[in-house]
Amino acid sequence: MLNVQRGLHTTVRLSARTKYTKPKPKPQARVIKSEPSQVTHHDNNLKIRAPIPPSAKNIVCPEDHPLWQFFADKKFLRDRADLDNHSRPWTIPELRRKSFEDLHSLWYTSLKERNILARENHLLKTAVESSDDSFEKVADKVRTTMWRIRHVLSERDWSYRIANEAFVEEVDSFVQEFEKDFLLLSQDEDEEAFEQLSRFQKSIFGISEFIDENVVNKRFIDGMKLIANLKVKKFSERNNDIKTFLDQTPNNKITDAGEAFLVFTCENTEKDVKEACEAVLELRNNGNAVSRYDELDTVAEYVNRLAQAQSQATQPVSEQSS
């Protein structure tokens, strides 16, 4: 019979590691021989130099720089002898004789001079620490001119408002009187008649001869209809077709904004007015009419289209092709 003794198995202990694994050596750095995919635009041969101390000589100011407007003849500070000490402010009667363009130019010239004097006076008080008030005296004279300009403009504004309020009550009688005089002018006086009509539509309704300068509002619509009817009545006495068209129109008066626009924009000749009347008859036969609720939007669109067509017609052929 075998005598078997129980014991511990030692295979695991004998197979166990007694040291850590030796680490692998680091790989050698690879040398990239290919060119970089992107080349920098900086210079690789830059050299560090000493800083340049700030100086006025290092600053180059362009001759057309806007800040030169605050300097008189590009001087840092004018002498007292360079100031206009012998002039006087503009008087109100003198300014009343000037046009709006002249007053506008004089205002901005005075404003520019006041800005120059304010800068020089500030330098005189702070940098130089002088008590000389020569610059302030000249500035006061310029300021007097400026408030007088505003006074004259205020007078004109109030005169315009008062005259406009008074004219509202007489505008209907004035329009009737002009219509009577306009239609009485003979065919030989057509040029003078339509010059008067142009001034009339500008003064009463604010309608310009240049279509792109107009603002379409109720005043424009009313003036457009009146001018269209005057043109039709003017030539109806000379052309039977136009007279027939006028007789077929209800109350002998064009009221549709689309119809009035056709006659209003045509040339002031018998032939063109006749063609416009024929176009209006075609619109009536097709049932095309503009509702009075859509007059403003529709006429505004007509005006924009006409202005674009005129601008394209005046462009050179090379610009249109491009």
From Swiss-Prot:
Main location: mitochondrion
GO molecular function: structural constituent of ribosome
Gene3D superfamilies noted in UniProt: 6.10.140.1190, 6.10.330.20
Keywords: Mitochondrion, Ribonucleoprotein, Ribosomal protein, Transit peptide
Gene Ontology CC terms: mitochondrial large ribosomal subunit
GO biological process: mitochondrial translation
Region annotation Disordered: where it falls in the sequence: 1-44
Family: Belongs to the universal ribosomal protein uL29 family.
Name by which UniProt lists this protein: Large ribosomal subunit protein uL29m
Chain's gene name: MRPL4
